[in-house]
């Protein structure tokens, strides 16, 4: 694993979840878009090695993907897909398109190139749901790790299990929570209380919830139409994401 205690790095954020279907990827893409719209240079790295979907979220089809550079087919500069002046995507193929065993060293070499040869303010890594060796390497190269969860009991259980394992590798202060699909403030309070009650009782730690998104049909429509809801006219949804982005902007400024 790589030690990232270096100066002048971009803020590297891994976005994880204990289970699939909680909105991790849609939050990643819209957070990146919000940060880029605010004038920051942002890279989205699709770290889902088996079923990547960030290119779907953005509605683009990059000609080259991360696995092309892992195997030496093209260099990294050919793989980084420019969506606008501030927003770039390191997309990937799913495993049924190109078979390739995970070579952690090659993936971490890409990381070294990113922080050495490119000037990004933020790198957002959209990881695969659940636990894997690759995920543990991603969290180790990240300054912050955000766990996305919702009110589904299995989401709460799996999020707790993920936190428990993460604490073996990173400091508690690096772990943040993002709650998705809330119905109202009472729903938010209930989810936040449940996950932190369990964490305090069994791990002796509580974790900061830095943002949330409501359940909204427009979010689901944006996925179907491969459009970002932060590009829509829905001011309320955009405000939720702007509040989340502001957390990272402030963190980047003062850390």
Show where each model-derived region lies:
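Acidic-aromatic/histidine active-site loop/patch
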Residues: 1-12, 250-255
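Walker A/P-loop phosphate-binding motif and the immediately C-terminal alpha-helix
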Residues: 5-47
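P-loop/Walker-type NTP enzyme "switch/lid" segment
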Residues: 44-121, 223-225
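Conserved nucleotide-binding/hydrolysis micro-motifs of P-loop NTPases
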Residues: 49-50, 85, 94-97, 130, ...
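Short, hinge-like loop/turn segments at secondary-structure boundaries
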Residues: 59-64, 165-166, 193-196, 228-230
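Conserved catalytic-core segment of NTP-binding enzymes
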Residues: 116, 127-211
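Beta-strand-loop-alpha "switch" segments that mediate conformational coupling across diverse proteins
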Residues: 201-229
């Amino acid at each position: 694993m790589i030690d990232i205690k270096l100066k002048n790095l971009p803020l590297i954020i891994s976005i994880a979840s204990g289970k699939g279907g909680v909105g991790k990827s849609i939050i990643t893409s819209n957070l990146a878009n919000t940060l880029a719209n605010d004038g920051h240079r942002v890279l989205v790295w699709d770290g889902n090695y088996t079923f990547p979907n960030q290119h779907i979220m953005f509605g683009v089809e990059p000609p080259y993907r991360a696995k092309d550079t892992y195997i030496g087919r093209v260099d990294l500069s050919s793989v980084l897909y420019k969506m606008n002046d501030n927003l770039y995507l390191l997309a990937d193929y799913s495993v049924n398109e190109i078979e390739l065993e995970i070579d952690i060293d090659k993936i971490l070499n890409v990381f070294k190139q990113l922080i050495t040869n490119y000037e990004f303010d933020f790198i957002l890594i959209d990881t695969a749901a659940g636990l894997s060796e690759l995920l543990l390497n991603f969290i180790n190269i990240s300054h912050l790790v955000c766990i996305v969860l919702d009110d589904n009991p299995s989401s709460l259980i799996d999020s707790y299990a993920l936190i428990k394992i993460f604490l073996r590798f990173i400091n508690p202060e690096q772990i943040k929570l993002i709650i998705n699909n809330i119905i109202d403030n009472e729903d938010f309070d209930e989810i936040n209380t449940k996950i932190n009650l369990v964490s305090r009782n069994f791990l002796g730690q509580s974790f900061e919830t830095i943002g949330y998104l409501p359940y909204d049909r427009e979010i689901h429509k944006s996925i179907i139409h491969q459009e970002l809801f932060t590009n829509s006219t829905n001011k309320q949804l955009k405000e939720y994401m702007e509040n989340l982005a502001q957390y990272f902007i402030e963190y980047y400024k003062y850390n």
